[in-house]
């Protein structure tokens, strides 16, 4: 923290780094303790298993532990190449339990960090549009794989579908992931 402050950094957001989903409440308790001891971070994006019917209760427990929470994140990116895949399948945004839990976020005042590959962006645009009262952040600038045209074209087409959505912001991070 001293090094960052010396370089002019004045605030930081902790974004969950893939703790086990059965430990996400413990994670919030831990990061709140870090904040209590140091004053850092200033905001938190946590995680919860949004495919679990009990995710609402988990998020309520997280919220009770920390006023720093601003949202939640669950990686949905799926790729034909298993090495790039995180989600169990390409259509996770259609899961009824997942969608019900996303529907809880606006009431919590939380955003959802959306991590998808370009091939999922058309689906993501419909998904984001279905939840107009929830803020979404497109993670890693939409997961552009490389600067080769075969990758840039679907990425650009996907961004054109997402760009008009007023409840979506893009995070410039992890470009080229």
Task: Report residues per predicted region.
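Short catalytic-loop micro-motif centered on adjacent basic/acidic residues
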Residues: 14, 43-46, 111-115
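Catalytic pocket-lining loop regions of alpha/beta-barrel enzymes
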Residues: 88-177
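An N-terminally biased module of ancient metal coordination in phosphate/nucleic-acid-related enzymes
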Residues: 1-33
